[in-house]
Amino acid sequence: MTDGVPARGSLRSRGAAAVSAYTLRPITSVIPPERAWGLWLSRQIIARIMGTFGPSLAGTRVEPVDTRLPDGRRVKGEWVYGPRTPTSETERSSTTVGAIYYVHGSGYAVCSPKTHRRLTSWLSSLTGLPVFCVDYRLAPRHRFPTAADDVRAGWDWLVTACGVPPKQIVIAGDSAGGHLSVDLLLQPGIEHPAAQVLFSPLYDLTFALSLARERIRPDPATSAANAVRLVGLYHSGVELTHQRLTLDVAGGPPLPPTLIQAGGAEMLQEDARQLAADIQTAGGRCELQVWPHQVHVFQALPRMTPEAAKAMAYVARFIAHALQDARALAEEAR
């Protein structure tokens, strides 16, 4: 745990979690993600919640990307520029000082760069950096390892086609996007970025950790059983023991400096704790923050919880320091 995290959640955030427990959780528990109408409804509900409680910042500019790498791999996504962040059309190259590569959450099946524009526009505005959010293909139409391969393609495009040095990039992701981000950094041939930021990362795809937490206190938004069904749309037909599903972080190379934030009311807080411990076991530096009484990816819902602004301000400082440290190391190596 780090300084700056309050000992208790605000009255508004605690109230929002309580309301969610009596409204959203009962709804998500009966929607069948395996059915086409159930998945469609889940996507609509999540998009409405994120649009209502976490709208994009006014003045945000978005540039769609749909291109291919020389080897034929397709890259889709969007550049997001928060208010006052230089764009590709300005005289100063927008990626001169660095960029953020964002991998959105989704349970691999329900979200998109559009649903996450509050997070990406906020990250851009607070850091002054452009954010590239990859639009990876979703399950069940596209199963494992499609999303992971799309995330790799997006990274390769950012580094090669856009010419952004890895040490000037910070990778960030939430929920399933956290799992995809870590998977990327464990792949051979990947030069690590300056840092990694994870919001409520999914780490244990068996959801055993979530189930253990659920026995102590239920998540106000969903259940472990429902999450298993949703994520199963992605890895169906593949054993969870696969090395790109059950990630061997503890036995792998040290990951770049990492900040993990999770909510104290969510079941994935146990994933956050385990991932942080495994990063440290492998020799990496990891800062873990569990914010009391906060829901899953609360940073994306500032109209619901005032703690979102405090958490994001901390993230911006972490990113600034990480890029500064990376530049200093590069200067020393010359």
Regions found by a protein language model. Give the residues of each.
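A glycine/proline-hinged amphipathic helix-loop "lid/cap" segment
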Residues: 1-92, 324-334
